[in-house]
């Protein structure tokens, strides 16, 4: 008789403990119900990137002196600089400049060490394509400035995200 009573008491204690755990989990769920959502609806809402965000590289062809500092400081020797030495003025003339963003690690060394500031980082981060060869940008593609997220009227920008409390 006693083993049956103790089993019944253990079953009751386990039931109460399980109900308490379920209640605790439900209270956590309810505490999150009155908070703002953490995620954004990406194609229709975009976050404003910070000032120091390292996105696609912008290149100004007229400022470049073909010194190749960007190639030397790049950890993967990525920028391709084609130039021709003009003997009459004894200066290099830039012919072609290209960067393959399929390989680029966006470290920003080329921008930081450029002596003429012809390279800069933009806020553009949507570089996805169906063909990886489309990620090889020449000086014309690098010279285009991206459309600012703030200026795009089709997208609702998110200025202030709720801060996560730890």
Curated annotation (Swiss-Prot):
Q: Which compartment or compartments is the protein found in? A: Plastid, Chloroplast thylakoid membrane
Q: EC number(s) on record?
A: 7.1.1.-
Tell me one GO biological process term.
photosynthesis, light reaction
Entry note: cofactor: Binds 2 [4Fe-4S] clusters per subunit.
Oligomeric state and interaction partners are given as:
NDH is composed of at least 16 different subunits, 5 of which are encoded in the nucleus.
Q: What family is it from?
A: Belongs to the complex I 23 kDa subunit family.
- What is the name listed in the Swiss-Prot or TrEMBL entry for this protein? NAD(P)H-quinone oxidoreductase subunit I, chloroplastic
The organism is Polymnia canadensis
Taxonomic lineage of the native organism: Eukaryota, Viridiplantae, Streptophyta, Embryophyta, Tracheophyta
